[in-house]
A protein has these predicted regions:
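N-terminal signal-anchor transmembrane helix
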Residues: 1-47, 89, 325, 332-333, ...
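Small-residue-rich helix-interface/hinge motifs
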Residues: 1-23, 43-101, 136-145, 151-165
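Membrane interface segments of multi-pass transport proteins and intramembrane proteases
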Residues: 5, 121-135, 165-180
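Select subsegments of transmembrane alpha-helices in polytopic membrane proteins
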Residues: 10-20, 103-112, 177-189
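Membrane interfacial helix motifs at helix-loop boundaries and amphipathic/re-entrant anchors
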Residues: 25-47, 120-140, 196-210
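Hydrophobic alpha-helical transmembrane segments and immediately flanking/interface helices
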Residues: 119-135, 200-229, 278-285, 289-291
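Alpha-helical transmembrane segments and adjacent TM-loop junctions that form the membrane-embedded core
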Residues: 139-228
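Tandem CBS (Bateman) regulatory domains
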Residues: 226-249, 260-265, 272, 282-368
């Protein structure tokens, strides 16, 4: 759900944010009723007010990342508020360890400043008042966010800072990502241990238990994804489109699908990509394997290849000399099953995403 723009940055809210709103409102309402002697309605209104303030703090935290990234020329696709707080999407990675470090620490720095301001307000406001209670809880939440996010494990901000440090020392960004990913898994395990300890001591509210466990699971999965991407990164130098791309087998427009498949099966390259060509022999479309698979075998002799082909202009293109980083970035920004490989204005082959996946993750099962 799109909420608008803040400083030109698109702001969205995930549906899971509603769960966060309900859980925090209920937890804080119970606390407010005890501390301030409020009725049920008053407690829930105060709880909702705290949620709004908390989400405002999260937004400022993410704006710290976004505006710092833009300061160094990194485009920002948007900020999303969700169950576990929020995240900022950027259109590319940081160009250097220094920029990576500054962008990663900008969010916790904002939270630390907000926490310090809330601490000062707590000390200045009369105890036992609504304003004092809200200031105290905002101080606690922002300090916790600043400290927890600074832990040195991905996907936390501190993990990105650690990645930048390892990157600076080793000159290998992917090594930094892998190191920070493994430490992120350790942080996830430590979070579970903390949840168990607090539960045994009955120091954790019942509604907070599943939320903290969800945080731990999210950390574990995020760390695992970071480790996976680091391993992929180590294999990117192996990407050579001249060797990886499948050759083209031209078939004239109007050719029955079954006939085109027969020609390919009997040819020298049975894994070739079927390219529909016009009367001049120019490729105009690419047969889509997914569409072919959906056609029953008995219909294929009567169906022209044009019916299961995509116009070449609608298929993402890659120059044959593109390196692994560029190929991966294109795959991220233009997801698809096939990519046209070009040399100048000529189409020289087709990259199948399954072939790229097999090269980058040879132990991972893929569908061809």
């Amino acid at each position: 759900m799109t909420l608008g723009r803040v400083f030109g940055v698109p702001l969205r809210a995930d549906a899971s944010m509603l769960l966060l709103t309900v859980v925090v409102t209920v937890l804080y309402a119970a606390l407010a009723r005890r501390q301030l002697d409020l009725g049920h309605l008053g407690g829930y209104l105060v709880g909702l007010g705290f949620v709004v303030s908390l989400l405002g703090s999260v937004l400022l935290h993410e704006l710290g990342h976004a505006l710092t990234a833009r300061r160094y020329g990194i485009g920002v696709r948007g900020i999303t508020l969700e169950l576990l707080g929020g995240y900022t999407e950027m259109d590319r990675d940081a160009p250097s360890p220094k920029v990576d470090l500054l962008v990663s620490l900008a969010g916790p720095a904002v939270s630390a400043v907000l926490g310090a301001g809330a601490v000062a307000a707590t000390m200045a406001l009369p105890a036992g008042t609504l304003a004092h209670q809200l200031a105290f809880q905002l101080a606690v939440s922002n300090v916790v966010v600043a400290v927890f996010n600074s832990l040195p494990g991905l996907p936390l901000d501190g993990g990105r800072a650690l990645r930048a440090a390892v990157w600076a020392v080793t000159r290998d960004r992917h090594r930094g990502t892998e190191v920070a990913g493994w430490i992120g898994r350790a942080v996830a395990v430590a979070t579970v241990a903390l949840v168990v300890l607090l539960t045994l001591r009955r120091a954790l509210a019942p509604l907070a238990l599943p939320l903290m466990l969800l945080v731990a699971v999210t950390l574990w999965r995020g760390a695992g994804q970071s480790i996976r991407m680091a391993r992929i990164g180590h294999r990117l130098p192996l990407v050579d489109l001249a060797r990886l791309a499948r050759p083209l087998l031209p078939v004239p427009t109007g050719t029955p699908l079954a006939e085109a498949q027969r020609r390919r099966a009997e040819g020298a390259t049975p894994d070739a990509a079927l390219a529909v060509v016009d009367s001049t022999g120019r490729p105009v479309a690419l047969v889509d394997p997914a569409r072919v698979a959906a056609v029953p075998a008995e219909r294929r002799p009567w169906l022209a290849v044009d019916a299961v082909a995509r116009d070449l202009g609608r298929v993402p293109a890659l120059p044959v000399d593109a390196d692994g980083e560029r190929v991966l970035e294109t795959v991220r920004t233009h997801p698809g099953a096939q990519y046209v490989v070009t040399a100048g204005e000529d189409v020289v082959g087709v990259l199948h995403i399954a072939d790229l996946a097999q090269l980058l993750e040879p132990k991972r099962k893929t569908n061809t």
